[in-house]
């Protein structure tokens, strides 16, 4: 019988009859990511994209810390490697992976396990990381007497002691507290000047726009009101981003529970959630549903937007910008890694190139290096600056001598490496439209 002939008794079978789908990510709080590791076929795209691996030859990279470690844990009880603490949580590996392996989810879970099981809770490193992770708590105290806090934190001796005692690099300038927090301003203002039940947004301002860069929060409110939106400012906690990066998952869950509940009420009443910080929007959209099983968490993820993104989707921003004009100014724009992960990396450049009076240049796709609290650790400072070197160079060769970014810690790094003033896109949008 030739190869082309078929046996008369042959009966094809349906794959669907025998196939049973495997739920690799069961919906449980105790998530086992080991099956998901099998989607990795070791192409090393994640390692190539990793900014830490590029400058630190001792760092094994995201492939090892993610799928390879989970594969090992499938076969034997092995400890999480301590190199997980060198991951900056930039999440660029998520975007790089062609197989959609949940790398950052694996890293966050592994880091949480390492901190919980292996880190000495009385060590200076743990206490320092806990303090950095809970910036909102520290800022709540410092902002009660902002002028005194700024004076004390600006003293040279404070920087020296901070490095020697807590491991916070003395090279860094501690950001100043605003003399009035955003929420204090909001209360004094009497809330939104627009009443429109059909166009409501709930503003998730995050920690930094509340305590430090209050003008960003004010700009967000004024711009959205200009488009007829009623702005709500619900009760809220930290997004949890610095807690994820430091393995403080219990702290992050505590904050997430409040945010899901409070923002969920606004969503139930028809509002969309708006964040002015791309790391905050990333946390609410991606990290919350990946790491926690909280009622309403998926709804929050689905209804969260970055501010500029929301306006570009729901309003005719192109026409509004083309009809506006500002004084001549040139910007060097850096897209935060967490903006890239959400597909938002060029939106500010595309928008403001249409604004009369503005020259804006994208300074490339490199990481700033600071990665939230990462660059605020003495042992990571040099690595942070090596990662940021490419961005600094591109900024200095750009036409503009004012930087622009959506991320507050990227703004710190940009200013630290170049001395440039750094602005948020919402501030320029307010200048153009309000």
Where is each model-derived feature located?
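Short cysteine clusters
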Residues: 40-46, 50, 87-93, 97, ...
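Short functional micro-motifs and their immediate structural scaffolds
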Residues: 48-51, 55, 98-102, 342, ...
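Non-heme iron-sulfur electron-transfer modules
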Residues: 2-29, 52-82, 100-130, 420-431
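Cofactor-cradling patches in redox/metallo enzymes
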Residues: 200, 206-300, 306, 330, ...
């Amino acid at each position: 019988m030739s190869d082309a002939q078929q046996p008369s008794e042959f009966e094809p079978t349906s794959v669907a009859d025998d196939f049973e789908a495997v739920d690799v990510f069961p919906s449980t709080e105790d998530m086992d990511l080991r099956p998901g590791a099998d989607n990795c076929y070791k192409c090393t795209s994640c390692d190539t994209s990793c900014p830490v691996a590029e400058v630190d030859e001792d760092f094994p990279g995201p492939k090892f810390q993610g799928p390879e470690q989970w594969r090992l844990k499938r076969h034997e009880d092995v400890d999480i490697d301590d190199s997980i603490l060198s991951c900056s949580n930039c999440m660029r590996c998520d975007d790089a992976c062609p197989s959609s392996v949940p790398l950052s989810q694996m890293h966050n879970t592994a880091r949480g396990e390492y901190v919980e099981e292996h880190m000495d809770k009385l060590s200076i490193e743990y206490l320092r990381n806990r303090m950095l992770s809970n910036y909102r708590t520290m800022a709540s105290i410092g902002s009660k007497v902002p002028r005194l806090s700024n004076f004390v934190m600006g003293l040279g001796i404070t920087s020296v002691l901070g490095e020697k005692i807590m491991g916070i690099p003395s090279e860094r300038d501690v950001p100043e507290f605003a003399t009035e927090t955003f929420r204090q301003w909001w209360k004094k203002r009497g809330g939104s000047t627009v009443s429109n039940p059909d166009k409501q947004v709930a503003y998730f301002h995050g920690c930094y726009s509340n305590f430090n860069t209050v003008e960003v929060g004010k700009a967000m409110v004024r711009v959205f009101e200009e488009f007829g939106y009623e702005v709500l400012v619900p009760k809220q906690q930290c997004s949890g981003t610095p807690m994820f990066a430091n393995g403080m998952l219990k702290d992050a869950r505590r904050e997430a529970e409040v945010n899901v509940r409070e923002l969920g009420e606004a969503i139930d009443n028809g509002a969309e959630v708006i964040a002015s910080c791309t790391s905050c929007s990333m946390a609410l959209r991606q990290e919350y549903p990946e790491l926690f099983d909280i009622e309403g968490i998926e709804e929050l993820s689905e209804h969260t937007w970055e501010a500029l993104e929301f306006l570009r989707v729901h309003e005719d921003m192109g026409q509004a910008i083309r009809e506006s004009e500002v004084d001549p100014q040139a910007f060097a724009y850096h897209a935060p890694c967490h903006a890239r992960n959400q597909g938002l990396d060029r939106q500010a450049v595309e928008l403001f190139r249409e604004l009369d009076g503005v020259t804006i240049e994208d300074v490339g796709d490199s990481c700033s290096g600071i990665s939230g609290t990462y660059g605020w650790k003495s042992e990571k400072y040099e690595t942070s600056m090596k990662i940021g070197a490419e961005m600094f160079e591109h900024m200095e060769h750009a036409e503009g001598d004012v930087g622009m970014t959506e991320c507050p810690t990227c703004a710190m790094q940009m200013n630290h490496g170049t001395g440039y003033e750094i602005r948020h896109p919402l501030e320029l949008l307010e200048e153009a439209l309000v």
